[in-house]
């Protein structure tokens, strides 16, 4: 590693430890020439994930964009922001582990809905209404009835 002070490429590692939840390694180094100490981080290089939008356009996956959408859907539901951050991290990890580097926005939306359904029914409905482009009250009623059937009798209030 090149010394930022002397530009020498010879250094020794003084200390190494996991950082960023185990996704990187933090190393404290010392230049063998000038004894300047500096820190480096080593991370696995990830190939960007391309999202295929509904209209066919492609864009790079943006965790901040997804997190923003989740925060909007989960406003005033009592869900902790750290849970949403974890959801996005886990989703991104699943996408990185796939063999293909392209994923449809529809697939991302469905993966998010599976997780949201377990966290908050209100957040699920709010996210689904945007993601599935609900056009009116019938779309909400249909989704609620489907949830009610799958959850069993007496789970949700009667709809209709």
UniProtKB/Swiss-Prot annotation:
MF terms in GO: ATP binding; DNA binding; zinc ion binding
One BP annotation, GO: negative regulation of DNA-templated transcription
rRNA-binding is among the record's keywords: no
Keywords: ATP-binding, DNA-binding, Nucleotide-binding, Repressor, Transcription, Transcription regulation
InterPro entries for this protein: ATP-cone_dom, NrdR-like_N, RNR_NrdR-like
Disulphide-bridged cysteine pairs: none
Domain ATP-cone, chain residue ranges per copy: 49-139
Known role: Negatively regulates transcription of bacterial ribonucleotide reductase nrd genes and operons by binding to NrdR-boxes.
Family statement drawn from the similarity comment of this UniProt entry: Belongs to the NrdR family.
Protein name per its UniProtKB record: Transcriptional repressor NrdR
Organism per entry: Parasynechococcus marenigrum (strain WH8102)
